[in-house]
Amino acid sequence: MATLHSPYRQDFDNNLKYNWSKRVAMSGIMRVFNACDECWAVNGSIKELYESDYGLKSACKVRLNATDHVPVPDAALAAREVDERYGIPSDATVFLFVGRINFIKNIDFAVRALARAKELGLKNFRMLFAGKGQDEDKLAALVQELGLTEEVVMCGLTDKDMLEKLYSRASLFLFPSLYDANSLVQIEAACQGTPAVFLEGARTASTITPGVNGYVCPASEDAYAHAIMDILADKDGYARVSAAARKDLYLSWDDVVRDVYADYLRLLGRN
């Protein structure tokens, strides 16, 4: 069996020069998957992509990702620890991105959207980037260019305990990536009741119900900025979405492993 998560054609289009080389690469990848007894896709959108566009013929089912994170026991204490470590005012609204600092994740979009939100009147906020990557210098230059040096905090790499506290401290998890298929970080955020804000057309948003346990908005910086401000203005609505994110989207690996084990036994028995 094999797992399906990466949008290979997109990777090959971005990194291979010649069409023949892209075809050879896709053919080689799909020969592997089509030789499997069963494939597991990380969400329904990826399953459809592989079956409709990539020519997957093997049996395929959706197997959702999960996390080993757990809800912080004391959110107020976690917030104080984060504020002290990163110099954040206790009354500041916090937004968070966790992952590779790479513009393929559309993190520059998030920064420009926040600059627009600041123009629209958003005050007293911090945008935390937790992670390392090849575009740290480019991101820092963009932050300076847009006048957000006070608002943007580069956290670097953190351990699991602090990462859970970062998710808990954040009001929103900003994830405008159009590249990711189904990221673990959105499940980690949901574990702490922190809803994610996605873009329309993002495959990684296919596991949420917009306005119920997460948010999806048009892929423009102005629309994203307005969405953030509208979400924060509707405190009752935000509380409902936050609770639903944890209830609907938080899934532990302990739960998933039981199902995976049963599937392994089923496949072994069939063969």
Predicted regions mapped to residue ranges:
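Membrane-proximal helix-turn-helix segments that form the acceptor-binding/catalytic region
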Residues: 22-39
